């Protein structure tokens, strides 16, 4: 039996999927995807994600997390403790259903988190969620935009072991530090339009790479909605950069995902 894909980071509760969730999931299955690991950005998505994972058991694999950047009306702002505290009980309520904690991390984009106070609060929110993951023995699904080195260093300081650095765009030296710590890195279909990622992908061993789409964002065309079935584009691009067959990349990245997310592995073996 051929090994299918695992999309290690997508957003199935996004508004962009609200009208055709079933069609998107069927298309994913038809394109050989074994599991969708779906993350959240804020507490308002938690119940919706549990509903979806109950509706599509052993296919949509839920992760709870509070993202470092939050929506603020029609804009965006840096996360605060107040975004996390009211939903802490939800993590415990659904801990048996969760396969990871995410999307969590740091985002030091200058116009979103310009002050040291904002960045310190992001780190506190990140730390609290890392501690929760450790207590629940769950991996973490991590965001690190404009903070690659700081994120890897902080993860190591906190003793995080099961880590996916999604859509990593930090320096190769920071990636190397993550590889040495045993962390995994995933890349969405948008890498096909970003030459700068080629160096990173070439440097990171295949044994430390997973596949993701970050759907509905980061697709092959910036203006189009991304969908999980585009995962093959990530796979084919990584294969071309590394001079490997796509089948080999699919097989190894799926095995990596099942090692990193043991609860996903258990669900797929039912």
Swiss-Prot record:
S-S pairs: none
Swiss-Prot/TrEMBL cofactor(s): Mn(2+); Ca(2+); Mg(2+); Zn(2+)
Binding site for Zn(2+) 2: 103, 143, 166
InterPro entries attached to this UniProt entry: Metal_Hydrolase, TatD-like
Regulation: The 3'-exonuclease activity is sensitive to the metal ion present in the active site, whereas the AP endodeoxyribonuclease activity is observed in a variety of divalent metal cofactors. 3'-exoxonuclease activity is suppressed in the presence of Ca(2+), Zn(2+) and Ni(2+).
Family named by the database record: Belongs to the metallo-dependent hydrolases superfamily. TatD-type hydrolase family.
Species the sequence originates in: Xenopus laevis (African clawed frog)
GO terms assigned for molecular function: metal ion binding; nuclease activity
Protein's UniProt name: Putative deoxyribonuclease tatdn3-A
Protein location: Nucleus
């Amino acid at each position: 039996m051929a090994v299918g894909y695992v999309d290690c980071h997508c957003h199935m509760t996004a508004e962009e999927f609200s009208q055709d969730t079933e069609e998107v999931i069927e298309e994913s299955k038809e394109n050989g995807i074994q599991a969708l690991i779906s993350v959240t950005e804020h507490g308002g998505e938690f119940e919706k994600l549990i509903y979806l994972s109950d509706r599509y058991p052993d296919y949509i694999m839920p992760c709870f997390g509070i993202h470092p950047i939050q929506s603020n009306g029609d804009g965006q702002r840096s996360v605060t403790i107040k975004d996390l505290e009211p939903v802490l009980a939800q993590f415990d309520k659904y801990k048996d259903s969760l396969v990871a904690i995410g999307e969590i991390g740091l985002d030091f984009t200058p116009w979103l988190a310009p002050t040291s106070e904002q960045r310190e609060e992001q780190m506190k929110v990140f730390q609290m969620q890392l501690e929760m993951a450790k207590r629940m023995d769950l991996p973490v699904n991590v965001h690190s935009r404009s903070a690659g080195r700081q994120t890897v260093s902080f993860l190591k300081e906190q003793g995080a072991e099961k880590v996916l650095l999604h859509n990593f765009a930090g320096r190769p030296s920071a990636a190397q530090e993550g590889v040495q710590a045993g962390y995994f890195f995933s890349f969405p279909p948008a890498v096909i339009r970003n030459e700068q990622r080629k160096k990173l992908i070439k440097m990171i061993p295949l044994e430390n790479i997973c596949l993701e789409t970050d759907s509905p964002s980061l697709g092959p065309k910036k203006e189009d909605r991304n969908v999980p079935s585009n995962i093959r584009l990530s796979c084919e691009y990584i294969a071309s950069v590394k001079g490997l067959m796509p089948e080999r990349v699919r097989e190894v990245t799926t095995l990596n995902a099942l090692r990193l997310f043991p609860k996903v592995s258990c669900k797929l073996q039912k």
